[in-house]
Amino acid sequence: MKKVILSLALGTFGLGMAEFGIMGVLTELAHNVGISIPAAGHMISYYALGVVVGAPIIALFSSRYSLKHILLFLVALCVIGNAMFTLSSSYLMLAIGRLVSGFPHGAFFGVGAIVLSKIIKPGKVTAAVAGMVSGMTVANLLGIPLGTYLSQEFSWRYTFLLIAVFNIAVMASVYFWVPDIRDEAKGNLREQFHFLRSPAPWLIFAATMFGNAGVFAWFSYVKPYMMFISGFSETAMTFIMMLVGLGMVLGNMLSGRISGRYSPLRIAAVTDFIIVLALLMLFFCGGMKTTSLIFAFICCAGLFALSAPLQILLLQNAKGGELLGAAGGQIAFNLGSAVGAYCGGMMLTLGLAYNYVALPAALLSFAAMSSLLLYGRYKRQQAADTPVLAKPLG
């Protein structure tokens, strides 16, 4: 079982490197290829577009294959997409490479979660999914700084060549360590959409989107916030980014550790509440260096503490369409990144100081918590109504 979790964690590490590694090489990429930095920044959006487009397509048309074969196909797409990006010299080919790299992202998380739900004891699934997600958090802590170093010392192409080669190793681990099992719950194409008739998955999608949007409304502007509000120097940003990366790792670990004692719903709702409080503290107390570091750490820890319980809630409420539901969660996550960055930017467009980005951030996180509370209320009502419906008439 540990080898399966390790294999999936290696996969999410590679995805994390591909998704976020671009942020540390934009200047070198723009200079080398002869495009503007804003145009190079489009490569972030193309990856997100690949996630949004690829996840449902792969989820819908993969029902005839085993979960292991789907994983192998997804990792192969990672190799191809990152290799294309590495070898490209035109804007068009760079964009295509990023699109292909993003296609497998959402489906990989979904298939991985389904695999773990089938081989792990019910009470341990959330912890196992947290183990899978840990690869993404470690990528933020260690992988991305390594990629930035390679770009600065050699070339940005070395960063993405490393990602492509690493994913070949991931393919080998999937081939040897992941059991060849099928998702017998999958029905025909129409049946996979049946779960969307219930409000439950939509509330989880909303919680996922608003939760990520809340953190990203602030985190998208973390550098100017820390420099102009908290008073840190630019050289301190490397330490700060490693600190928040450590928060992501520890938040995910803590979520998995307590999953045996608390339900996924309780973990997610309480985490969103803590994030709301942390964001409000970042608004009011951002001028105090130590305080801003503490609550920045808490916000980023909370972001990844949400990942595993929300993934489990989606699987529980997507019967017959588990892969589509999990992929939809990744779409909601990426949509939240865009919504959050836009909402935070609105405060700056109005001419307000950088600490004001924490206000829409807190509001979005409160919306995430509210979505989860509404979900809990709906499930309680559903449970209360079931015995009544079961009684014979007359």
Curated annotation (Swiss-Prot):
InterPro entries: MFS, MFS_dom, MFS_Efflux_Transporters, MFS_trans_sf. Induction: Induced by arabinose. Transcription is dependent on the transcription factor AraC, the cAMP receptor protein (CRP) and cAMP. It is a multi-pass membrane protein. GO terms for biological process: transmembrane transport. Residues 28-41, 90-93, 152-155, 222-235, 285-293, 343-351 are periplasmic. One of its GO terms (molecular function) is transmembrane transporter activity. It comes from the Bacteria. Disruption phenotype: No visible effect on arabinose uptake or growth on arabinose. The chain crosses the membrane at residues 5-27, 42-63, 70-89, 94-116, 129-151, 156-178, 199-221, 236-255, 262-284, 294-316, 323-342, 352-374. It is found in: Cell inner membrane. Keywords: Cell inner membrane, Cell membrane, Membrane, Transmembrane, Transmembrane helix, Transport. GO terms for cellular component: plasma membrane. May be involved in either the transport or processing of arabinose polymers. This is Putative transporter AraJ. The gene is araJ.
